[in-house]
């Protein structure tokens, strides 16, 4: 049975004009002996969240011991995010069911609790690079618009196999491949062309496993791939992410060279990615080269859709955190001079100063040696475009005092954009989403804030969250 058919059995029709779902009375009331109705005795559907309904109505996917753990740990937050982003009830159920049915099994085995009642990073079955405590799920909330913000919920995951880290699958490559070739992938509209191209160029074979394990630097991750799902109003968009680090260790080439060669290989064989793609990549390579090795290509992503509609994004991490250096990077050292980039730089200046509370644009943020410290950029390549389009990820996890400080400062920036609902409610939303996180005393719930700008869409921002399954 498809997700659509299942959802119709639970929610017979989309919400009506009065805001209630057709077939769902606001209250089921008990008739009293005098003919009146007791409004307090019956079951109020308004008191049940979609998470509650699906928990009661749907069997857990196999293996239930693991998917049950992930549903309890993550399902409530996913449901709340869909509600706060104002998804219609029917769409809320549709996407929460998709998460329940198709995504939960990808999160892998539940952690062994041993003598503890709460998981910790030390007993994570696989050390996912997706979040700093190895939680393999990172939901995010995108807001964009020239006036009031429009919202989209997204989720990033690292699919984890039950043999991840073992001799048969030491780098956790099997689960993502199996999913992308499954019926479940067709349910989320994923196509394979670009996925297979980059998988073939980035994944490593069994003949190299032993040698690569010996080469991995201390403290380095071995994640090979992520998936992400944009829960748009009309459809799901699937994205695949690949890490070039193992292929870099295998070949002795830089991660930038590994990615560049793969894109060149694609452009030479594709009717879609041609000379413009090669030119855009060369602009990026020239900028990366100007840093003398300090800027490193971290990963690459593609939209798993028709090639003509897809994008290739190259993610680069640099150690610099001064506003001046960040703005220089955003425009690729002056190589991007279009109006979108110029206006984006003005807004980025205001956002950075607001979130980090800095005045001096030459001042670096406090020194931090964590593997995920520094500033990340992605540069987007599109078919037919001669230049990449920039996006920056503000590393708030490492450089702010607390998550509530981040939220409060974001509210200030939202107000300047005219996003008054987010200005008024974002702090309250955060507390409701993560009631058990120490939001006022630590960071770790927000991971990054991304920012880009286009005149047609306005400011385009995403707040990324760590559910902190393995940390308190």
Curated annotation (Swiss-Prot):
Annotated site residues (Required for regioselectivity) in this chain: 156
Q: What is reported when this gene is inactivated?
A: Leads to complete abolishment of hexadehydro-astechrome production and no intermediates or shunt metabolites are observed.
Q: Which gene encodes it?
A: hasE
Q: What is this protein called?
A: 7-dimethylallyltryptophan synthase hasE
Q: Entry's Pfam families?
A: Trp_DMAT (PF11991)
Q: What upregulates it?
A: The expression of the hexadehydro-astechrome cluster is induced by glucose. Expression is controlled by ambiant iron conditions in a hapX- and steA-dependent manner.
EC assignment? 2.5.1.80, 3.4.11.17
- Where on this chain does dimethylallyl diphosphate bind? 154, 239, 241, 313, 315, 393, 460, 464
The record's note on quaternary structure and interaction partners says: Homodimer.
Q: Does the keyword Hydrolase apply?
A: yes
- What keywords does the record list, in alphabetical order? Aminopeptidase, Hydrolase, Protease, Transferase, Virulence
Q: What reactions does this protein catalyze?
A: L-tryptophan + dimethylallyl diphosphate = 7-(3-methylbut-2-enyl)-L-tryptophan + diphosphate; an N-terminal L-tryptophanyl-L-alpha-aminoacyl-[peptide] + H2O = an N-terminal L-alpha-aminoacyl-[peptide] + L-tryptophan
């Amino acid at each position: 049975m498809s997700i659509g058919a299942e959802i119709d059995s639970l929610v017979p029709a989309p919400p009506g004009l009065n805001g209630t779902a057709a077939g769902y009375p606001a209250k089921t009331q008990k008739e009293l002996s005098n003919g009146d109705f007791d409004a307090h005795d019956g079951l109020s559907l308004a008191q049940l969240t979609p998470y509650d309904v699906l928990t009661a109505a749907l069997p857990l996917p196999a293996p239930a011991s693991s998917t049950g753990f992930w549903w309890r740990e993550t399902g409530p937050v996913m449901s709340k995010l869909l509600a706060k982003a104002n998804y219609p009830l029917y769409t809320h159920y549709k996407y929460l069911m998709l998460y329940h049915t198709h995504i939960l099994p990808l999160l892998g085995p539940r952690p062994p609790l041993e003598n503890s009642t709460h998981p910790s990073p030390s007993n994570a079955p696989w050390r996912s690079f997706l979040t700093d405590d190895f939680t393999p799920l990172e939901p995010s909330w995108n807001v964009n618009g020239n006036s009031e913000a429009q919202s989209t919920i997204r989720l990033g995951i690292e699919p984890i196999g039950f043999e991840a880290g073992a001799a048969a699958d030491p780098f956790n490559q099997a689960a993502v491949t199996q999913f992308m070739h499954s019926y479940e992938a067709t349910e989320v509209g994923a196509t394979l062309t670009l996925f297979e191209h980059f998988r073939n160029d980035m994944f490593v074979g069994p003949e190299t496993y032993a040698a690569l394990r010996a080469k991995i630097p201390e403290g380095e991750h071995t994640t090979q791939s992520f998936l992400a799902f944009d829960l748009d109003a009309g459809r799901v968009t699937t994205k695949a992410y690949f890490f070039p680090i193992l292929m870099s260790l295998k070949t002795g080439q830089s991660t930038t060279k590994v990615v560049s060669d793969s894109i060149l290989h694609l452009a030479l064989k594709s009717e879609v990615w041609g000379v413009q793609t090669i030119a855009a990549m060369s602009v990026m390579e020239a900028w990366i080269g100007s840093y003398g090795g300090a800027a490193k290509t971290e990963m690459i992503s593609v939209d798993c859709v028709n090639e003509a509609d897809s994008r290739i994004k190259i993610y680069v991490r640099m150690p610099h955190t001064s506003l001046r250096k960040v703005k220089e990077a955003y425009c690729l050292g002056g190589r991007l001079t279009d109006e979108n980039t110029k206006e984006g730089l003005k807004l980025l200046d205001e956002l950075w100063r607001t979130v980090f509370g800095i005045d001096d644009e030459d001042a670096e943020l406090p020194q931090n040696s964590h593997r995920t410290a520094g500033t990340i950029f992605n540069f987007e390549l599109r078919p037919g475009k001669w230049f990449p389009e920039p996006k920056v990820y503000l590393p708030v996890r490492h450089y702010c005092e607390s998550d509530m400080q981040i939220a409060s400062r974001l509210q200030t920036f939202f107000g300047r954009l005219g996003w008054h609902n987010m200005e008024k409610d974002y702090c309250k939303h955060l507390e409701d989403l993560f009631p058990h996180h120490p939001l006022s005393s630590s960071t770790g719930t927000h991971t990054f804030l991304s920012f880009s700008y286009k005149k047609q869409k306005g400011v385009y921002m995403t707040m990324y969250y760590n559910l902190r399954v393995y940390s308190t």
